[in-house]
């Protein structure tokens, strides 16, 4: 466990919170903007490096405040350029952050919790259970660490990180306040200045918090659907028993409508061999989503040992995609990235594994995938 210093961690404070902090120590509010730029634009965690701040104020800040991100345990780089950081948070748990480069775009996949309580049956993160919510500093700290790793300072110039998705470990809407604060920092010009269209929150379907979301922020929304009917989704995504599909999709439509723009819901659908990849599932999905403006992202399952699931054949994936296309949907198939460093979708487990264990796991993944049809899939990259 990382020992607490008792000082105020400025890393996770929004502009409004930072201004209140400077009020509380008897300083002018404009200091908030100065300090935020040093922290987020330049990656500075040493008050003495803040050269446009008076020495007296720097000494005052050192006495009562700090800039402290999660502890970097390891950084791995995949053969395809994907990067994964394992970071330790104050609770002592480890979480993972993944960067996916693609042309001029670089997407950072950020975790919101250590572990996850939702226990989706095909997700390795859920297998470890729930450990703790991350603080706002620990959520935005993942962006801060990645940005510094790329040397992208100031953060708004020639940025490596163009998009952020809250699709890492955990259910973001079950850590609502801290995730909202972190997303505001992602979009704030004093933070990382990322467009609201390029910040996406992914949820498994916590309906009351989807309804609450529009009161606080207007980021893009992705729904982890994974099944076209309640009976199957109850098995794959147990929270569906509490918030079934009709209720869930209604809440998503309300949120998208509240944005007042031509923005659509992203549907995420992990494809599992002989479970949810059949023609009848595609037909059900077409009917289910007919009143929901959306784009669909098909995610071939990334196997992990003892999951009990397999990746569908390429023919099955292509057939499913074609049926949805023919019905008029915009459909993409997600390219698996970072599989050799356990950074692929559904593989994030927050464990610090030695090289031997990682190699064994990678071999197991390849063996589980061996039966998949070798025919190429026509992939539209997102």
Swiss-Prot record:
S-adenosyl-L-methionine binds at residues 170-171, 202, 224-226, 302. The active site is at residues 96, 345. Keywords: 4Fe-4S, Cytoplasm, Disulfide bond, Iron, Iron-sulfur, Metal-binding, Methyltransferase, rRNA processing, S-adenosyl-L-methionine, Transferase, tRNA processing. Its cofactor is [4Fe-4S] cluster. GO terms for cellular component: cytoplasm. It comes from the Bacteria. It catalyses: adenosine(2503) in 23S rRNA + 2 reduced [2Fe-2S]-[ferredoxin] + 2 S-adenosyl-L-methionine = 2-methyladenosine(2503) in 23S rRNA + 5'-deoxyadenosine + L-methionine + 2 oxidized [2Fe-2S]-[ferredoxin] + S-adenosyl-L-homocysteine; adenosine(37) in tRNA + 2 reduced [2Fe-2S]-[ferredoxin] + 2 S-adenosyl-L-methionine = 2-methyladenosine(37) in tRNA + 5'-deoxyadenosine + L-methionine + 2 oxidized [2Fe-2S]-[ferredoxin] + S-adenosyl-L-homocysteine. The keyword Ribonucleoprotein does not apply. Its EC number is 2.1.1.192. One of its GO terms (biological process) is tRNA methylation. Its main location: cytoplasm. GO terms for molecular function: 4 iron, 4 sulfur cluster binding; metal ion binding; rRNA (adenine(2503)-C2-)-methyltransferase activity; rRNA binding; tRNA (adenine(37)-C2)-methyltransferase activity; tRNA binding. Transmembrane segments: none annotated. The keyword rRNA-binding does not apply. Disulfide bonds join 109-345. Residues 102-342 form the Radical SAM core domain. InterPro entries: Aldolase_TIM (IPR013785), Methyltransferase_A (IPR040072), RlmN_N (IPR048641), RNA_MTrfase_RlmN (IPR027492), rRNA_lsu_MTrfase_RlmN/Cfr (IPR004383), rSAM (IPR007197). Binds 1 [4Fe-4S] cluster. The cluster is coordinated with 3 cysteines and an exchangeable S-adenosyl-L-methionine. It is found in: Cytoplasm. Specifically methylates position 2 of adenine 2503 in 23S rRNA and position 2 of adenine 37 in tRNAs. m2A2503 modification seems to play a crucial role in the proofreading step occurring at the peptidyl transferase center and thus would serve to optimize ribosomal fidelity. NCBIfam families: rRNA_mod_RlmN (TIGR00048). Belongs to the radical SAM superfamily. RlmN family. Reaction proceeds by a ping-pong mechanism involving intermediate methylation of a conserved cysteine residue. This is Dual-specificity RNA methyltransferase RlmN. It comes from Pseudomonas syringae pv. syringae (strain B728a).
């Amino acid at each position: 466990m990382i020992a607490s210093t008792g000082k105020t961690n400025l890393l996770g404070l929004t502009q409004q919170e930072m201004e209140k902090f400077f009020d509380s120590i008897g300083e002018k509010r404009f200091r908030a903007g100065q300090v935020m730029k040093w922290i987020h634009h330049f990656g500075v965690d040493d008050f003495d490096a803040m050269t446009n701040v008076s020495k007296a104020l720097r000494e005052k800040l050192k006495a009562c405040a700090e800039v402290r991100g999660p502890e970097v345990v390891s950084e791995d780089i995949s053969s395809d350029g994907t990067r994964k950081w394992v970071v330790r948070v104050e609770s002592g748990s480890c979480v993972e952050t993944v960067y996916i480069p693609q042309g001029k775009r670089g997407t950072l996949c950020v975790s919101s919790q250590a572990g996850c309580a939702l226990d989706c049956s095909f997700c390795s993160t859920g297998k470890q259970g729930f450990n703790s919510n991350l603080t706002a500093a620990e959520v935005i700290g993942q962006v801060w660490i990645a940005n510094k790793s790329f040397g992208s300072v100031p953060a708004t110039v020639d940025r490596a990180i163009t998009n952020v998705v809250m699709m890492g470990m955990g259910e973001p809407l079950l850590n609502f306040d801290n995730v909202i604060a972190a997303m505001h920092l992602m979009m704030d010009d004093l933070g990382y200045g990322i467009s609201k269209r390029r910040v996406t929150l992914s949820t498994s379907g916590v309906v009351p918090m989807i309804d609450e979301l529009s009161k606080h922020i207007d980021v893009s929304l992705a729904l982890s659907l994974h099944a076209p009917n309640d009976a199957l989704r109850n098995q794959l995504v147990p929270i569906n028993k509490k918030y079934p599909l009709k209720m869930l999709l209604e809440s998503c439509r309300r949120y998208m409508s509240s944005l007042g723009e031509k923005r659509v819901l992203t549907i995420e659908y992990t494809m599992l061999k002989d479970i949810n990849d059949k023609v009848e599932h595609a037909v059900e999905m077409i009917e289910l989503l007919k009143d929901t403006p959306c784009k669909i992202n098909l995610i071939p399952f990334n196997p992990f040992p003892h999951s009990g699931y397999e990746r569908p054949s390429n023919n099955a994936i292509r057939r499913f995609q074609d049926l949805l296309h023919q019905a008029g949907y915009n459909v993409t198939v997600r390219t698996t990235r970072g599989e050799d460093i356990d950074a692929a979708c559904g593989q994030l487990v927050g464990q610090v594994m030695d090289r031997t264990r990682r190699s064994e796991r990678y071999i197991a993944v390849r063996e589980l995938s061996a039966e998949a049809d070798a025919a190429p899939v026509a992939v539209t990259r997102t």
